[in-house]
Each structure stands twice: as C-alpha cells, then as structure tokens.
C-alpha cells in the first residue's frame, strides 16, 4: 500500500463530508453546502480546503461546476484503510459489471427495451455507490452544476423510489429526463442544476414515474 497523504483534521472532515454526500445523494456537495455544514463564514473557506486536498492528490477539482469534485479512488481508499473508516468508494479491480447503454428512449416504451440499447460496456462495479442496472447517455447541460455533462454516461439503479434531493431519471409524459427530485407535501418538482434551465413542476394528474436513481457517472472520454 502506498503511503497516504497527511491530512489536517479539517481536511479529513471535509473528505468525510464529500464521501458521505456522494453515498447519500450520488453527487458531491457544493462549496456552499460544505461551508454551511462546517460553519464556515463563506464558500471561499471551503474552496481553500478543497484546493489543499487537490494539491495532496486526494480529490480532483473540475472547473465550471459547483459540484465539480471527484475523489481520487486509490488515494482515498488508502486514507480510509489507514483510519479503519468504511465508505463505499471506488476500489479498482474487485468486480466488473456489463451494463447496457441506453440512448434515446421512445415515448411510451420501457427504458430497457432492446431497441433503446445502443451497446454494452464492461466497467468496474466498485465505481458506484450502489449497483447500477444500466447506463444512460446524458443529453444537454441541464445538470451541469452537479458535474453531469452532455455526453456523460449516468449509472442508474432501476427503482421507483427516491428521497428528496436525490438525482433521478424520471418519465414525465412522453419524455425521460435527469433531474434532482424535490417533494413538498403533495407537490413534485424536478430541479435542474443549471440556472439557464427552468424548474419542471409536475401537475396533479400528469403522468409521472421515477425510473431510476443516479448512482454514479462515467465521463464519455474515459471509455474512448
């Protein structure tokens, strides 16, 4: 095992927060969320600690998105092992999954219908917080600030249930979309992670189903 970088207590706290957020919601926290959780006066304080973690090779920061934080799997795994901590993190080489890649989904037909499957990919199962059932090719930039870009492959666990704040694949009428779920009483909203896109409000009686839960992301460049 390679030596782990030495982290300050605050850096370790932030790393644990990032891992917990990814395991719980499928996405890393924003700088503002880190600041609020840890009592910082501003998001800039969180940014300084994130930059320090990046310099130590623990995370990678992706510019242009508020949730652009990627864990460096091997380094983080070594840190956790040294502390006896357990998080569901990438552990390369332990397992492989063959997943169908779903392209465009025709209105009214199941997502995993054969005609929607463009091809299959074999990927590390340990890349994901929970076992996915398929990959969905992302189209558009409505989830940019969650680090989900046009052309990325979203790992999806098929389920009809999701908690507030989780990123879901939803069928609304004839359309399939990736958004963050927000329920307020009986009201349902599908939130983009890009201010250029509107909030989608599900009207009473409008056909709506949760098709799956985002459990990971693969950059399309990783598979080229």
Curated annotation (Swiss-Prot):
UniProt GO BP: DNA repair; DNA replication; negative regulation of DNA-templated transcription; proteolysis; SOS response
Catalytic activity: Hydrolysis of Ala-|-Gly bond in repressor LexA
Keyword Nucleotide-binding in record: no
Active-site positions on this chain: 142 (for autocatalytic cleavage activity), 179 (for autocatalytic cleavage activity)
E.C. designation(s): 3.4.21.88
Sample GO molecular function, one term: DNA binding
DNA-binding residues (ranges): 31-51
Swiss-Prot/TrEMBL site (Cleavage) positions: 107-108
Entry keyword set: Autocatalytic cleavage, DNA damage, DNA repair, DNA replication, DNA-binding, Hydrolase, Repressor, SOS response, Transcription, Transcription regulation
UniProt keyword annotation of ATP-binding present: no
CDD domains attached to this UniProt entry: S24_LexA-like (cd06529)
Annotated function: Represses a number of genes involved in the response to DNA damage (SOS response), including recA and lexA. In the presence of single-stranded DNA, RecA interacts with LexA causing an autocatalytic cleavage which disrupts the DNA-binding part of LexA, leading to derepression of the SOS regulon and eventually DNA repair.
Matching PANTHER family: LEXA REPRESSOR, LEXA REPRESSOR-RELATED
Subunit structure: Homodimer.
Family assignment from sequence similarity: Belongs to the peptidase S24 family.
Protein name, as recorded: LexA repressor
Organism listed in the record: Acidovorax ebreus (strain TPSY) (Diaphorobacter sp. (strain TPSY))
Gene that encodes the chain: lexA
């Amino acid at each position: 095992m390679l030596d782990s970088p030495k982290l300050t207590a605050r850096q370790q706290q932030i790393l644990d927060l990032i891992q917990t957020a990814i395991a719980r919601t499928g996405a890393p926290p924003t700088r503002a969320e880190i600041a609020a959780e840890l009592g910082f006066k501003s998001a800039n304080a969180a940014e300084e600690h994130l930059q320090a973690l990046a310099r130590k090779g623990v995370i990678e920061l992706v510019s242009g998105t508020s949730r652009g934080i990627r864990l460096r799997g091997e380094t983080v795994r070594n840190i956790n092992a040294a502390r006896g901590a357990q998080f569901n993190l990438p552990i390369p080489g332990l397992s492989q999954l063959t997943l169908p890649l779903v392209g465009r989904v025709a209105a009214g037909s199941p997502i995993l219908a054969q005609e929607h499957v463009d091809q299959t990919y074999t990927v590390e199962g340990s890349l994901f917080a929970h076992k996915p059932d398929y990959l969905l090719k992302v189209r558009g930039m409505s989830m940019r600030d969650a680090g989900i870009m046009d052309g990325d492959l979203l790992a999806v666990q098929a389920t009809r249930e999701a908690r507030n704040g989780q990123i879901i694949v939803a069928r609304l009428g004839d359309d399939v979309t990736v958004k963050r779920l927000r329920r307020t009483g009986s009201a349902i909203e599908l939130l983009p992670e890009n201010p250029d896109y509107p909030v989608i409000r599900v009207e009473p009686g409008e056909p709506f189903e949760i098709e799956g839960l985002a459990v990971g992301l693969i950059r399309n460049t990783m598979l080229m």
